[in-house]
């Protein structure tokens, strides 16, 4: 059996909000496997559903740039939050995002190899910045959204500077209406995405493995009710339908009023402007999402430096 360390218990508590003894028991029952322990706690009703696994721990900035019918989103990581406030780092994020937009880049390796505005490549400028700022930095990911007609709108939450912050969102609206008409709706929808964190545009687009995991948890919880099999099946189907509804953008309740599905908000906006509007897609980057940052033992570092 794997050793159940205090660090494992702490991580499980941080990710689930469950009590210490419950976390210890979950880890013991699942041989120290964090993900299996989360599912075990949820089947016992001791932990809330986690939309995405993994601690969010990396620093840096997410930047966006749009030009009407196109938008680019880029994440650049650093070791500390302090670098995210550095003007040179912010200028790099701004330039790299513009490069991604101008060149239509969707691949991080292609972005690294792209020409940088002041000369050389993006990767070479990044290397120069690392030497100047004195802290490791990396290009993490890039995304591009386009529409044939309409608008792609961007939004950042917790902005450190114009167009860059901790959470970045792009929303694509297809319509014959002008970009200036669509901009207010796009901004509100992007703010909704930042807050509600949908996992897909439609319920049917949700990741199959994620839905299967939710179904397994729902089946275990429903089985514990002791109800007849046909009732248990309906309970499971209801739980999955609720999961799809709450995690798909078009069926989520609009955060601005808390009662209207996003699909209805878009349809109503189309009637208001006299042109059909289709929400074609969205991209949401949360800084450090899915990256586990190694925690250092400061006392041990000092001791090592002193040769103790």
From Swiss-Prot:
GO terms for cellular component: cytoplasm. SUPFAM superfamilies: Elongation factor Ts (EF-Ts), dimerisation domain, UBA-like. Residues 80-83 are annotated as: Involved in Mg(2+) ion dislocation from EF-Tu. Coiled coil: none annotated. InterPro entries: EF-Ts_dimer_sf, Transl_elong_EFTs/EF1B, Transl_elong_EFTs/EF1B_dimer, Transl_elong_Ts_CS, UBA-like_sf. NCBIfam families: tsf. HAMAP family: EF_Ts (MF_00050). This is Elongation factor Ts. It comes from Sphingopyxis alaskensis (strain DSM 13593 / LMG 18877 / RB2256). The gene is tsf.
